[in-house]
Each structure stands twice: as C-alpha cells, then as structure tokens.
C-alpha cells in the first residue's frame, strides 16, 4: 500500500507540488479575516458566572472602563499652584477623550460646605495659579481628609495625584475604539510631559489593560516567529547537514503556518496573546514530521541505492507512526476545547489545524520536494547514528539500574506537585517590557491599586438607600473592609451622606455621621444631586430608583488565594451582619481572573481524561497489544507529573495557562513513544530480534530523529518562553520541561520497561510450559 502510494507520489511529484500550492493559497486567503482582539473579556465565556455578575453590575451603574493618568511632580509635592494648575489643565483636556463619561481629579472634586442655610458645591480648585499659600493649605487639608480621594486620586503624602477618565465605548467597532482612546490619552500625556518637564505621567486602567493584550500579541508575532525560523534552520541544518532537506523542511513549516492562520481566519477566530503563539507551536510540530522522514531517508540513501527506493523505505517506516503521532497531537490540542477560557480553545483548534496540515504536507509536498531537489547520498555513517548505537547498547547493559533510578526520580519529583498553588494576577500576565505593567506597578506602589472588588448592595425597596439602618450597615461593611490587609481604598456612598450631613450642620465635625432620619437623608441626597454639575453625578454609586448602592474596594496586588479568602470573609460578614437584600458576591475583572484558574482546572480535567482515553485506545489499536498499549502510557504520563513537580520545587505558582499543559503535552509526548515502539515492534516482528536487540535496533533507526525532533520542540517552546505575555511564557517553559523529561523517559525508562516486560512474559511462558 505504502509502496504504491510512494510510486504514485514520485511519478507525479510536480503535480503534487502544484496541487499543494493551490490548497495552501486557498487556505491562506483566510488570513485577511484575522484581527487582534483588545478586550480582556475574551478570556471568559458567556456562561462564566463571574462575568455575568460583573455585566449586571455594569448595567446597573455607569460603566467604569477607565484610563488613569497619574501625575508625579519631580518636586515630590502636588500641592503647589504650578502643579495644581497642570492638574486643572489636564482635567479640562481629558474631557475631550473620545467616548468620555466623566473625569475625576483632585481639582474638580465636588467640595461641599455650608453658607448660611445653603449647601455650596464647587470644584475644590479653580484657577490654581492665583492661590495664596493659605488657600493651598486649605485644599491640601480637604483633599487629604477626604476618604473618596485618599489612596484613589491623591496619595497620603501628596507626592502623586491622578486624573481618572471614565469612558463608555459604543462597541460598534471595538478594534478601533480602544486604540482611539489610548492614542488620545498617550498623546495628552506626551504633550504635558514635553510642556512641563517638572512632571512625569504614568498610565493605567482597564482600557490600557485591554490595549496591552493587543500589544503583547503583536510583539510576539514580530519577535518570536523570526527567532523561531532562525532556530529551526540552524537546528535542522546542523542535524541533517543537507541543504535541500533543510529547504524542503522550511517550506513545509511556512505552508503549515500560513494554512493554520488562514483556516483560523475562515472560521472566524480572533487573535489574542495565547493564539499569537500558534505559528511557533505549528512550526515545532511540522518540523518533527519532516525530520523523521528525512533522517530515515538519509539512513537508507547510499551511493549504491536508488533515491526513489530510499524515499519509499523511509515512507514505509514512517507513514503509520507519523500519522498516529499527528492524530494524538491533534487530540491533545483539541482537548483544550474543554478549557473555560475561549482563547485557549482557539489556540487548541488553530494548532490542531496546523498539525493536520503539517502531517499532510510532510507526506505529500515534502517527499515530492526531496525527489525534485538535488540530494547527495551520505558518504559515511553519521556520528549521530554511531552515538545512538552506542547509547542503545549502554541502555541495554544498564537497564536494571536505569529503571530503578528513573522510578526513584519520578517518585521524588511527584512529591513536590502539592507545592504548587493556583495564582492568576492579571497585571502580571505582562512582563516588564510592556508599558502597562511597569506603569501599573508604579501606580500601585504610589497611589492606588488596579485590583478591585465591587459590590451592589441592595436596600430592599425603592428609595431605601436613605434608610438609616441600611446606611449604618453599609458604613460598617466599608469600615470592616478598611481594616483588612491589602486594602488601599474603599469608595462607599455613606462618605457622601456623612459629608453632606456635616455641611448641613454648619460643618461641625461632630455631625460627620449618617443622618438620623430617612426623610432627612433623602432630602440631603436630593439637594446634593441637584447641585452637581454635568458628568459628575452619583450614577456611578447609586442606581436609578435608589434601591441599591455600589461599593468599590481597591486592593494591592494580592495573590488569587488571598483575594478569594478576602472575598470569602466579606461574604461571611454580610451574612452575619447585613439584611438579605445586601447579600451579593463581589464582581470585577479582578474576581473574574481570580476564579478562572480554578474553573479551568476543573474543565480541563475532563478534557485531559477524554484525551487520555482516546490516545490510549489509539495506542492499543496501533500496537495491537493491550499490555503494550497500557505499558506505553507510563512514559507518556510520567513527564507531565515530573514537570509539575519540578515547577513546584522552583516556582510554586500555576495559573490559567498551566492548567491546559497536561492535555496539550499528552499528545506531543506520545509522539516519541509511538516512534520508538513502532521501531521496537518492527525489530521484534519483522526481523525476529530479541527484546535487547530490538531496543538497539530502535535506537539506531529512530534515536537520532527523536533527539532532533525533541530538540526542535524544546527549542520552539523555549523561544515561546521569551513571550512578553506571561501565560504564553510559563506555558512554554512547563511544556519544554515536559518534552525534555519525555525524551529522558523514552530513552531511559521505556526501554528498561520493555525489556522487563518481555522478561516477565518469558518467565510466565516457562511457568505455563512446566505446569503443562
């Protein structure tokens, strides 16, 4: 069958090349439909309960998609006429931000005070350059005593201040809207830094986080793919030392990548940081298929042998294992469809398409190119082959010792798996080459936190937020939160009510408390709302029928476990101290990312089990042996377990990306096992070799190819570990580690197990013979 296929392929090689090019260009034409997404929500499915809770919050109150400009005077003091004047100007200009809803700063803070029987509401700062020192001191005293400003808009020491721009994106063209806002804000910051060298401006906010996803994706495309091409060229070139083979491999890689990307465009997949790693992954998979065909071709091709015969022999040896490894690899990546995060589903589907395309090209285009391009037969046995023969002999001689050493290493490393803990801090998804990360770290250290938990706390009836009992509970909840470690700021409606109540009692400090009567509180609220200017109303804090208020808690950069523990304690407090209408979970992007790791682990567990069952069935069917198929699972499951153990020893934190590694690598590491076992069984069945000699035969025929392909895979994922996006980087590091350990297991654990298995079978046969 293979011989006939090979003969047809060799005969019609030019037609094969032509048809392949037609297919590739048809698939690649879908690239025009690809676009980058700039929305963090892409990581969450429509069914995600945390996202649904956040959407409900956003629909109840004004959306809080924001851009925060943090101004740092080099003098270390915000409270001077010059700096306050700059803040005034930035505040005014920030209103021109596309889609802006409101702008909050220390200068336009709606300061209230009593004047006779009237409530005066005005900007805290107007015309700062005209201020006398006494006026500056008054502004400083008010700002640093105001809970709604401190650790949100102004630092306690007064050394930095922020201008927060809230926007409402129409979401008609999200790909253009976010960059439009980002471009405006960055232009504004650059303009003021150039105009006033005495200040520095740092930028953060939800919109900058959204934009960072796009920047990380584009950065990976621009840097990692070229590096990977160079690595593959050098690796394959040095390993096979055949220019035409290297060129053919390179063409297969390029066609596999553009086909995968084009097919993704045809099915409507959006590019995100995880899917931006597709070219690197497809490249490593495609090169593995080609190397197996090429190395066996070169081993068979001698001056005395026909080129076509050598290629036919290589295809005969590799056709089945290359198909099986492609199938198992595709299954491993398709298991990522069980992920709770859509970008990882997209990644799995894109790489699976690339793997299948790479397989088809490696058994059509690649051998056709080998026949077309000039290839000189090797003059002598390669040093790599001689080394593998010697190494195979070493493994056979030392099989007992190697088996026990490997088993001890496995047990030792597996013991460290519990040292890992789940942690998803979304700011740390980006490394420090991304401006969003460095600016956000600076702002967290100096002013306020990017991490936030928001609550919608119901009063149980329309207008109920003026009820003193409700307000007292709300105030107690806010005070409880302010006492918790890691909390920077709590924005709560009661701060407004206490301030207005004090104003209405001649600004006497003793009256800085909640009004005693509901009617009085309602009147104060109405009076205050009527005095507020356009764009600075309370719709970001209270709902339309005044039956609920929003409380925002800003946090330091807490770990996932710390964050979930804090929210759990908050729920306990609400259930013990608050009326039932106030019971509700915290909602925010922070909470969404905090839960996603746990949700993904649970969903991927099922995907990994299904992948394992399917791959096991394929191996048993391929090897035609239930015992051999079951035995082969040991070197396939052990590497991931060892890798997570190593990760627990040296890193100790796993997150969203690492929860897909087991399913993903399962299909990859099976490749080496399938190739080794297929050659082992070929030696046993076709050549009648003993178990020890069959191991030697497997090392001599496939050992070098396994070494090169594993090296290519490891190199590919190590290149991906240079990604500026931490999810890609950590996933790549763990995957590279898993593949390295898989090679070790296939070279040092699988052969001793095979020989031990054969020895046990022989002893069993002898015992049965004696019994008869």
Predicted segments with their positions:
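Hydrophobic alpha-helical segments
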Residues: 260, 264-375
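Pore- and gate-forming transmembrane helices of large, multi-pass membrane proteins
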Residues: 223, 285, 289-290, 302-339, ...
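Interfacial segments of transmembrane alpha-helices in multi-pass membrane proteins
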Residues: 218-269, 339-342, 606-651, 722
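Hydrophobic, glycine/alanine-rich multi-pass transmembrane helices and their short helix-loop junctions
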Residues: 235, 323-366, 370-373, 616-620, ...
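Extracytoplasmic
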Residues: 55, 59, 85, 130-243, ...
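Juxtamembrane segments of multi-pass membrane proteins
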Residues: 398-521
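Hydrophobic transmembrane alpha-helices and their membrane-interface caps
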Residues: 245-293, 628-677, 718, 745-748, ...
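Signature of alpha-helical transmembrane segments and their immediate interfacial
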Residues: 1-36, 367-368, 376, 380-426, ...
């Amino acid at each position: 069958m293979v011989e006939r296929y090979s003969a047809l392929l060799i005969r019609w090689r030019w037609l094969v090349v032509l048809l392949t090019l037609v297919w590739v260009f048809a698939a690649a034409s879908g690239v025009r439909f690809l676009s980058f997404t700039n929305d963090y929500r892409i990581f969450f499915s429509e069914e995600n309960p945390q996202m649904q809770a956040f959407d409900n919050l956003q629909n109840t109150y004004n959306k809080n998609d924001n851009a925060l400009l943090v101004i740092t005077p080099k003098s270390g003091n915000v409270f001077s006429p010059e700096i306050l004047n700059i803040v005034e100007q930035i505040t005014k200009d920030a209103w021109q931000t596309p889609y802006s809803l409101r702008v909050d700063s220390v200068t336009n803070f709606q300061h209230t005070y009593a004047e006779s029987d009237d409530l005066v509401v005005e900007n805290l700062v107007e015309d700062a350059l005209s201020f006398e020192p006494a006026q500056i001191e008054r502004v400083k005293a008010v700002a640093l005593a105001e809970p709604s400003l401190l650790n949100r808009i102004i630092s306690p020491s007064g050394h930095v201040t922020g201008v927060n721009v809230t926007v409402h994106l129409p979401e008609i063209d999200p790909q253009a809207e976010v960059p439009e806002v980002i471009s405006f804000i960055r232009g504004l910051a650059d303009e003021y830094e150039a105009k006033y060298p005495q200040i520095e401006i740092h930028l953060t906010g939800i919109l900058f986080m959204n934009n960072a996803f796009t920047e990380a994706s584009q950065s990976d495309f621009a840097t990692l793919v070229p590096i990977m091409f160079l690595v593959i060229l050098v690796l394959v070139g040095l390993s096979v030392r055949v220019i035409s083979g290297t060129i053919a491999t390179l063409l297969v890689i390029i066609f596999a990548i553009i086909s995968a990307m084009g097919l993704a465009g045809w099915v409507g997949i959006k590019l995100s940081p995880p899917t931006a790693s597709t070219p690197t992954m497809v490249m490593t998979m495609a090169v593995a298929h080609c190397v197996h065909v090429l190395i066996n071709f070169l081993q068979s091709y001698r001056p005395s042998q026909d080129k076509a015969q050598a290629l036919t022999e290589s295809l005969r040896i590799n056709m089945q294992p290359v198909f099986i490894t492609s199938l198992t690899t595709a299954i491993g990546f398709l298991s990522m469809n069980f992920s709770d995060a859509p970008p990882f589903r997209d990644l799995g589907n894109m790489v699976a398409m690339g793997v299948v395309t790479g397989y088809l090209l490696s058994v059509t285009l690649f051998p056709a190119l080998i026949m077309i391009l000039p290839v000189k037969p090797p003059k002598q046995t390669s040093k790599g082959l001689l080394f593998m023969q010697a190494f195979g002999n070493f493994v056979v001689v030392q099989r007992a010792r190697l088996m026990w050493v490997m088993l001890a290493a496995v047990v030792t490393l597996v013991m460290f798996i519990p040292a890992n803990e789940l942690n998803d801090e979304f700011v740390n998804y980006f490394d420090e080459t991304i401006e969003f990360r460095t600016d956000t770290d600076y702002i967290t250290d100096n002013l306020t936190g990017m991490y936030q938990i928001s609550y919608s706390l119901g009063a149980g009836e329309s207008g109920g937020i003026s009820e003193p009992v409700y307000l007292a509970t709300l105030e107690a909840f806010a005070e409880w939160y302010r006492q918790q470690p890691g909390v920077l700021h709590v924005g709560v409606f009661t701060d407004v009510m206490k301030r207005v109540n004090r104003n209405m009692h001649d600004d006497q400090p003793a009256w800085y408390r909640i009004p005693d009567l509901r009617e009085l509180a309602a009147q104060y609220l109405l009076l205050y709302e009527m005095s507020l200017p356009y764009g600075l109303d309370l719709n970001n804090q209270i709902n339309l029928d005044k039956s609920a208020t929003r409380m925002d808690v800003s946090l330091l950069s807490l770990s996932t476990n710390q964050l979930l523990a804090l929210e759990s304690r908050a729920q306990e407090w609400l259930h013990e101290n608050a009326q039932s209408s106030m019971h509700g979970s915290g909602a925010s992007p922070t909470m969404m990312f905090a839960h996603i790791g746990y949700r993904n682990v649970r969903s991927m567990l099922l995907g990994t089990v299904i992948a394992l069952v399917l791959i096991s069935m394929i191996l048993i069917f391929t090897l035609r042996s239930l015992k051999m198929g079951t035995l082969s699972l040991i070197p396939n499951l052990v590497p991931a377990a060892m890798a997570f153990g190593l990760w627990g020893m040296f890193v100790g934190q796993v997150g969203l990306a690492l929860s897909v590694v087991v399913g993903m690598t399962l299909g990859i590491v099976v490749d080496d096992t399938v190739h080794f076992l297929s050659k082992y069984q070929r030696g046993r069945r076709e050549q009648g070799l003993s178990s020890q000699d069959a191991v030697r035969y497997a090392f001599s025929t496939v050992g070098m190819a396994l070494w090169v392909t594993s090296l290519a895979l490891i190199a590919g994922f190590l290149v991906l570990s240079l990604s500026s996006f931490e999810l890609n980087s950590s996933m790549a590091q763990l995957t590279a580690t898993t593949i390295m350990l898989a090679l070790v297991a296939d070279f040092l654990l699988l052969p001793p197990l095979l020989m031990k298995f054969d020895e046990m079978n022989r002893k069993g046969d002898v015992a049965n013979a004696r019994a008869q």
